[in-house]
Amino acid sequence: MRTSRTLAVALCAVALTATAACGKDGSPGGSAASSASNAPALPTYTVKTDVKVDSPVIAEAKKRGQLIIGAKADQPFLGWEDVASGDRSGFDIEIAKMIAADLGFTPQQIKWQTLVSSQREPAIAKGQIDFYVGTYSINDERKKTVSFAGPYYIAGQDLLVKNDNTSITGPESVSGKNVCTATGSTSIKNIQQYNPKITQFDTYSACVEKLLSGEVDAVTTDDAILKGYASKYAGKLKVVGKPFTKENYGVGLNKDDKTLRDAISDALKAHEDNGDWKKAYDATLGLSGSAAPAVPTLERY
Amino acid sequence: MSLFDRPATASVLYDVPGPKARARYRLFGILSLLGVAGLLWYVIATLADNGQFDADLWDPFQYNAVQQMIVDGLLSTLKAFGLAAALSLTLGALLATGQLSDHRPVRWTCTAVVQFFRAMPLLILIVALYYAFFAKDPMWALVLGLTLYNGSVQAEIIRSGVNAVARGQGEAAYALGMRKSQVMSSILVPQAVRSMLPSMIGQLVVTLKDTSLGYIITYNELLFMGKKIASQPLNAAGFPYIPVVLVIGPIYIALCLLLTALARWIEARGRRGANRRTSAAA
Amino acid sequence: MGFLFEQDNFALFRDGFLQTIELSALSALLALLLGTLLAAFRVSPVPILRAFGTTWVTLFRNTPLTLLFFAVTFGLPPLGVHFSHLVFAVLALGGYTASFVCEVIRSGINTVPLGQAEAARSLGMSFGQTLTLVVLPQATRTVLAPMSSVFIALPRNSAIAGAFSVPELYSAQQTFSERGYSIFAIFFWVACAYLLISATIATLFRFLETRLAVAR
């Protein structure tokens, strides 16, 4: 019994690795956030040495030599992971790298953990991750379980529709229409008052697939996220362009760790002031065609 | 055409077909084959029209990193399955012992535990364990959830297996002056095991399939990897959900069939050892 | 525990509960019909139908239900099949459970004494008549016990639909934990709901067993 199962497992593994032996390395050119040759270059950040942050989370991270940062992986230009190369890119990823540098961690010392919207609060509260950077809107309900540093970006909820759709022009026109959004996001509550039929998946990419296949009429969430998809599927999808909420993106972290919150706020402030923020924006979200907005003022508490 | 001409003799439900019936069956056969083939053709043609077989959509699978992800996912699935299988069989044996106990409180407690975990959706159990205790280590939420549920089912299988042994066996053993533990370990369980094995391994197949629920709690198993490949496409051709299902599905099916084959082999061996009469198949 | 009666929580919980019941009932119906049909295929004299039944059962029994949900939710729309997510869930859950129902019925058919089918055939009954008038009614009794485990498992499995845009109990649980309530309190109520459902089904089957036992 034991031997035949081991044999079976070994056979499967061999079969798979055998096919794996003839694969390609790297990733195809022109993937989501990697860009044309004349695109603005990503900034590099000087890693601080000798950082003294008296936070249990950072002490733990120092001990393990790795900073565990939660992020999204399926949002072009914001939080994207290329499955072929394993590289992460996007504005949220840059923000996370800036903060990591100021906390004394090189990009190689960052361990990324992909988390979908509904998994964020438990993962932060229970310490699965050190902090989270991924289109995380600051609101009071969430402040009951986690705390936020930021905002580092201000987005607004908008609608993504098919290119030839003329009937959806704003939130007022979605009544009775089929609208898709992600479980555990603030977008659900905001759109509910306009009476659409709501479809929910755990990721926005599932929603976009449903939009492409015609199952839903629109996808709603923050314009920053939608713009990424619209430019990835240029010619097929468009953003309606009438934001109807204001979403303050913050870095989510442990509720009681004020030291870490202040350290992250300081890091954001420093990189906003020295121009890294703008450079990072131009090299990521800026590629989807919209100019850099004003840097939002940090709220410290 | 041997498939159509093979005389159907194996069943008691119908007579060996004569020439007319054979012709009729052949007609049915051809019609249903046409129907199935037509449906299959429609599915494949529509999917092809839809661009589901375009090289661009299948592109991810040719990269080393993606293939490595699938192998890693498979290994994580097998790891969770191995742990859950071992733990659930242990828990099952313990709970079954409790359920067969002579002490009423023990019996009632074990029965309550078994009934509770048999009724709870595994998904909800796993998510609750993840949120409450194992956010740092999702694998243990998955393994523990699988253990609690499958352990309860295994306990039921063991209990009913032991109860199904002819009553005279136990009575004879008691009459010889054996203690309860002796009756159990040397008379009842050895006889019960033979009849229990197929259902126990069947439940292990269920355990293997249910490891896929780990994707919901960020455990990097096979389905989690598949979902990642599907939702992070390398190009703008769309999301390769169908290619991923076509790649991941057969892997799961192959694993389960291997386990089932094992079950059948053990069953056959057990039958041989018991000198049982082979029962007539319908 | 008291959170259930705050805000609109109870309405959400009740809707989720009813949706779970609706989903389970529809899937059970589909599974029963399809499963019986597949079982008839698997014992039929037409080899192609037997092969079809065997293939279906092999495919659906050995694929994780979650993967089936993916296949149905993302695989059918490109085929031009557009339904609500509830119907998709019923198809996935019903098709999956049908393969188990089929196996239970098939083994039930095998337990009917040979003489019964032989007698029916010697009276000149066709395959269809033998099956529907003589064998299946007798098999019903022996399949009740294994069938009850299949149908108790069904509402449990239906929780997976919550991750595929069907607002049932699991997705109510998700919403509650997003609202920041204690996971233990949420789990308590959801557990109560599922225990109620499975106890009801178990009672129903026990009732059927006693009813049919009298007829024997």
Question: What do the predicted segments below correspond to?
Answer:
Chain A
Residues 32-42, 47-132:
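Extracytoplasmic small-molecule ligand-binding "clamshell" domains
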Residues 19-33:
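Bacterial lipoprotein signal-peptidase II cleavage site
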Residues 110-122, 166-167, 183, 199-213, ...:
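Short helix-initiation/N-cap motifs at beta->coil->alpha
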Residues 108-173:
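Acidic, polar ligand-binding/catalytic clefts
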Residues 119, 135-144, 212, 217-246:
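A ligand-binding cleft/hinge motif common to bilobed small-molecule-binding domains
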Residues 88-103, 136-137, 155-208, 223-227:
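Bilobed "Venus flytrap"/periplasmic-binding protein-like clamshell domains
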Residues 154-161, 223, 227-268, 288-301:
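Periplasmic-binding protein-like
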Residues 23, 38-52, 185, 251-289:
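Extended ligand-binding regions for polar small-molecule ligands
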